[in-house]
């Protein structure tokens, strides 16, 4: 089932002249929560230049569900399978 409501990233992009975010490049326990606490608009998870795998990204996306943050995932290539996995896991945007 597809949720038609706008995500946090879309809301921030449509309501602010500029948005700010930070990037996580490896497994961490504090990343997304600290970005939310600092007032960032989004958090990105970098699987292209970082040390994150599908499972790590899925865990971190799950941790952001209750946070007022948009989520972006940067993948190393445009293969459909990983794009689908991170989209299914809840990413607001895939780069």
Q: For each predicted feature, which ranges?
A:
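Expand to "…catalyze enediolate/carbanion chemistry for C-C bond making/breaking, isomerization
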Residues: 1-95
